[in-house]
Amino acid sequence: MTAFPAFRGMPRRLAIAAALATSLSVMSADHAESPGADADPAADLADVFIFPSPQGSGRTVGAITFAGRSAPRSRIDGDIPCDRNVIYTFHIDRETGGSFDNVADVQVHARFGRNGRGECGLQLENVPGAGTVSGPIETVFEASGLKFFAGTRNDPFFFDAEGYAALVASFAAPGQSGDVAGAFRLGQPRRDSFAARNISAIVFEMDNGALTGGGSSRVRVWATTGRIAG
């Protein structure tokens, strides 16, 4: 793929900002879906991450997760959807003159496809420091000294869905203020409703110099998905 076809409206957009000069890790999350988005799991974004690469300095990791199942629904999780008609885009806005203009300076595109044997693979386009790369899913592959991965992983998103439900329900009860047993409270045991749940992930390293364009170390990123029109 050297060019991407036109695609329909973006059903999901998540945004965060990060300073590459610090050991900052940030994420944005969206796990509660409308029926329309929930009906298209391959295009349903969950989180976007950016953090320093643990493999060494000079590299930053970007990640998009999608196709998760919101707790407390069925705990039967499937494999990564290999949908060639979905385009995943990681948008990068570089800081200029101390501010952001909310327009992407760099766009990393990702798309799945199958070879003649029916095996699923991922292609990434316009990766800072690597350009276009491709490889099989569920395998870490390398190009230009950077690492890439697409497949299923334990969902890193942490959320106490049971506590949230108890908190919301308490406000509907006469005389309750939300401070009830089982609700969100500081100092109380935490429950991770997404623990041991599969999430589909696209993960890629970027060269810091190419990521920032040699300018400010601060960037703002967001992710979108879109279906190819046809």
Which functions belong to the PLM regions below?
Residues M1-T2, S23:
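Intrinsic structural disorder
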Residues M27-G230:
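Surface-exposed extracytoplasmic segments
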Residues R13-S25:
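Bacterial N-terminal signal peptides
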Residues T2-A15:
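Bacterial N-terminal signal peptides that target proteins for export
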